[in-house]
Amino acid sequence: MPRSRINGNFIDKTFSIVANILLRIIPTTSGEKEAFTYYRDGMSAQSEGNYAEALQNYYEAMRLEIDPYDRSYILYNIGLIHTSNGEHTKALEYYFRALERNPFLPQAFNNMAVICHYRGEQAIRQGDSEIAEAWFDQAAEYWKQAIALTPGNYIEAQNWLKITRRFE
């Protein structure tokens, strides 16, 4: 039984119903429908914290999905899971791959900035201010890209950029 049919969450059920209706009325191939089913099941598992199951579904969706835009969201969600698991190098890789397919994902730029900022803070704790500054500079670049895509968002990042004099 597909995961979407066993999930008890009202929002997930509503999303599943709407998605199923759209899949019936929008002309798509069976491969696209199957890819979306795996993607939807991956999102459901991810929202419940079942990351291993979510990854399996996302990898299967990636195998089937051919549209670069849709693939970007699958890759982004894989990056989210790796971020949640503390696997920052892997997360960055997936965010980069998502952005290669869809450069208009401000949330990917934001998450990359957060990881770089975190690494900068780690470097400070280890007493390496030079490496910390490099990480903070990289975080600033990613936040600038996120802000350029969605100027009204990421207010905390905008404040950090101004306070640290990294905002142009």
From Swiss-Prot:
Its record classes its membrane topology as: Peripheral membrane protein
Question: Pfam families per the record?
Answer: TPR_1
Q: Where are the TPR repeats?
A: 35-68, 72-105, 120-153
Q: Which GO terms describe its cellular component?
A: chloroplast thylakoid membrane
Where located? Answer: Plastid, Chloroplast thylakoid membrane
Where it mainly occurs, coarsely classed, is plastid
Annotated signal sequence range: none
Q: Which UniProt keywords apply?
A: Chloroplast, Membrane, Photosynthesis, Plastid, Repeat, Thylakoid, TPR repeat
Gene Ontology biological process terms from the UniProt entry: photosynthesis
Highest taxon above the source species: Eukaryota
Q: What does this protein do?
A: Essential for the assembly of the photosystem I (PSI) complex. May act as a chaperone-like factor to guide the assembly of the PSI subunits.
State the family named in the UniProt similarity comment for this chain: Belongs to the Ycf3 family.
For this entry, the protein name equals Photosystem I assembly protein Ycf3
Gene symbol here is ycf3
